[in-house]
Amino acid sequence: MALIQNPNMKHAPFLRNRSPQQTLFIPYTLSLPISYQNPKRLKTANSSSSSSLLAPVILNSPVASSSPPPIYCAPKFPCSSGAATVPLSRVWREIQGCNNWKDLIEPLNPLLQQEITRYGNLVSTCYKAFDLDPNSKRYLNCKYGKQTLLKETEIDQPEDYQVTKYIYATPDININISPIQNEMNRRARWVGYVAASSDDSVKRLGRRDIVVTFRGTVTNPEWLANFMSSLTPARFHPHNPRLDVKVESGFLSLYTSDESESKFGLESCRQQLLSEISRLMNKYKGEEMSITLAGHSMGSSLAQLLAYDIAELGLNRRIGKGDIPVTVFSFAGPRVGNLEFKKRCEELGVKVLRITNVNDPVTKLPGVLFNENFRVLGGFYELPWSCSCYVHVGVELTLDFFDVQNISCVHDLQTYIDLLNQRRTNSRSVDSDEDEDSDNVALEFLKTNGEKMMFLKRQRMMYWSNAVDLLFSFSNHMSYCNIF
């Protein structure tokens, strides 16, 4: 597949300056036995200085200054993920990205690593609970009730959050097949949930956390929505539609389409989310709050659309108080909109942390050719198509595992989470009881994920086959548009 990065290529293509996007590169290599690459150079965009509260848990961070951050060599081994010395309740705003995660990525701050993992596990719940059995009464719905979802999916500390609403999305897809099949394709399906932190967890988190999680692409109509690669105005604000702010039409359709013609009259994904978030914000309006949106693959696109929607409508603004932070944790997410979408998100204070794998082709889509890297010629001349280029939003935390070549594994959410937690220290104490064999770390990691992905492959082979058949029914024009 032409879009997949060749693992035998040098890493140089990934080290080019991605300005104006802030890029933070974390070297990571898995091989048998483990081999570590030479230190790579990092380049970060300007951002505000980080809080001094986080100083005790940041190791080897560069000295802050008013001048642009210098180019420096990353350490050969990532930072240790040992216990943090500052409680989350004191620094949660920094962890949520108030300073664009400055000095928290390289080396990776233990608290940030912990929170990314926690939100990633909340997203994985959507996959574990999604019913794909056509013979089940809960087909395309969640297997469990809201009260038992987190416990049934064996999430750590399920009592920390209370699920308040399930979210459904309706793909607006019509292709040249039978009317009955088209009706099934337009059927709403469960894509995630809204949850609020419990009273007991508020003390540890430092605020009331409203969380929305989205799963990635699973069903055939969702695959087709991903291939509707054309930019269209979002038009979220009723009085100021901002026609220059454009997003990918397939993601927008999934976010805004409803099932109003059915006997149930289900609202769109957007209406469900805005209504529930507004209700929760009104319920906890006297408390310190945060809005955290997390998603994998297609779900990260929905999370970014929701974040922009909330901020554009001003739902997170409070009179006489500071704005409620809106943060997106994106796992393996594609590009969502154009340059104006990125600029507007930054103006509104939407924070996005993108966790990506350099070998994951999904993170290169859409806009394989025309994107933020080919918008300006020679660093000076704006190209005519720059307004139509897809652009990533936010700060990028890159996991580099070139030796993982399984196409299923490189995009798998659990692989992302596992790799994020396979951090190694610069040095290990001689007296440490953890005398593990370093040559077996990568072997165990690949073995575990390989067995898991082979099981999933056998379980879902029918769905992949159907997806391929449907994709081949697309016109050559649509396929051409997706490449660009």
Swiss-Prot record:
SUPFAM superfamilies: alpha/beta-Hydrolases. One of its GO terms (cellular component) is plastoglobule. Disruption phenotype: No visible phenotype under standard growth phenotype. Keywords: Chloroplast, Hydrolase, Lipid degradation, Lipid metabolism, Plastid, Transit peptide. Belongs to the AB hydrolase superfamily. Lipase family. This is Phospholipase A1-Ialpha2, chloroplastic. It comes from Arabidopsis thaliana. InterPro entries: AB_hydrolase_fold, Fungal_lipase-type. Acylhydrolase that catalyzes the hydrolysis of phosphatidylcholine at the sn-1 position. Has a strong galactolipase activity toward monogalactosyldiacylglycerol (MGDG) and digalactosyldiacylglycerol (DGDG). Low triacylglycerol (TAG) lipase activity. Plays a role in plant growth and in leaf senescence. Residues 1-63 form a transit peptide. The keyword Hydrolase applies. Its EC number is 3.1.1.-. Its main location: plastid. Pfam families: Lipase_3. Ubiquitous. Highest expression in flowers and leaves. It is found in: Plastid, Chloroplast, Plastoglobule. One of its GO terms (molecular function) is phospholipase A1 activity. One of its GO terms (biological process) is triglyceride catabolic process. The active site is at S297 (acyl-ester intermediate), D360 (charge relay system), H411 (charge relay system). Induction: Induced by wounding. Not induced by wounding. It catalyses: a 1,2-diacyl-3-O-[alpha-D-galactosyl-(1->6)-beta-D-galactosyl]-sn-glycerol + H2O = acyl-3-O-[alpha-D-galactosyl-(1->6)-beta-D-galactosyl]-sn-glycerol + a fatty acid + H(+); a 1,2-diacyl-3-O-(beta-D-galactosyl)-sn-glycerol + H2O = an acyl-3-O-(beta-D-galactosyl)-sn-glycerol + a fatty acid + H(+).
